[in-house]
Amino acid sequence: NETTRDIVQAELLGSPDDPDAFGSGSIPLSRIIKTERKPGVPNAKSVALIKHVSGGNSSLHFKSYDMGQEKWQGRSVDVVWLDEEPGRDIYSQAVTRTLDRRGMVYMTYTPEAGMTETTSSFINRLQKGQSLTNATWDDASEKISSMKGENGHLSEAVMEQILSAYS
């Protein structure tokens, strides 16, 4: 759907709105072998074939939660990236799809819905093989991060602007 295209696809392949930006995401153009268009969603991809650093190829499959868990079933995969909190049915499918390959499931989200079952399981009941990275406001700050030898991405002026929008 549009959200998958505008967030995950854009991060990995480059802005879907600008043909010249294709290959400017986390995956460089030189590694993108081919893509398949997603029917019904302008500028969206359903699959991308990527030249892996190992010499083999990896296929990326872009799915959205609104497709339902049935569309997530069957295929064994190495990695699943869940952007925004999934329902338990999708999360369970993601874990199941990676089991036989000893793969990984990444989730990146702000717990907008509060202490859901998924959020609680990571905050209160972290299991062996799981990890939780808690990104804080200070982690985003250029000033505070630079004092720790890290790279934040928000200037003080931008942070003040964001905070004032919530006041």
Regions found by a protein language model. Give the residues of each.
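Phosphate/NTP-binding elements of NTP-utilizing enzymes
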Residues: 1-167
